[in-house]
């Protein structure tokens, strides 16, 4: 099955390495642990911001966010406006949780996004690879059971192959 293949690849093909950790404070709360991961295949760095403690037996609030230059920084998609600050505010309010920011560095990522905006198409992209990177970061952090922070009802692909479970959902809300 696909879950078996994913499980095999997770156990045999580790594609991320934890390269740096630092305690940080931000406009959205103090005492965040910032962990930098590097994808061993393309050397791209991804970020996990951890608030509070992680217990592998507990349900942990988690937001996995695919960073996009134009949507997150320029604001070309009003549906994604302010999602990173809202996520950090929500996790800070909960006093525990993780925000994972996965960078999309595929060739043509920016131009393909802009073309899909104009043509009103799904940008598709390399979601499977992004899920794999995010899942391996969650595993490295010791997370098994997640309270998914999201306003979307989309179900991520084959999480059981990663031995990850979405046990509940938590709306992102307005970030206040």
Feature roles, as predicted:
Residues 2-176:
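Catalytic domains of riboflavin
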């Amino acid at each position: 099955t696909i879950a078996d293949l994913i499980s095999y690849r997770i156990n045999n093909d580790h594609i991320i390495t934890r390269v740096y950790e630092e305690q940080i404070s931000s406009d959205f709360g103090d005492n965040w642990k910032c962990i930098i991961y590097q994808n061993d295949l393309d050397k791209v760095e991804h970020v996990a911001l951890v608030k509070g403690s992680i217990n592998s037996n507990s349900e942990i609030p988690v937001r996995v966010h695919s960073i996009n230059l134009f949507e997150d920084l320029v604001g070309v998609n009003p549906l994604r406006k302010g999602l990173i600050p809202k996520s950090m505010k929500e996790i800070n309010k909960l006093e525990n949780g993780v925000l994972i920011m996965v960078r999309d560095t595929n060739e043509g990522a920016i131009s393909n996004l802009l073309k899909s905006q104009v043509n009103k198409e799904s940008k598709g992209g390399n979601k499977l690879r992004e899920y794999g990177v995010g899942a391996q970061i969650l595993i490295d952090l010791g997370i098994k059971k997640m309270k998914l922070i999201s306003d979307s009802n989309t179900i991520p692909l084959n999480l059981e192959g990663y031995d990850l479970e979405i046990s509940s959902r938590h709306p992102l809300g307005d970030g206040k």
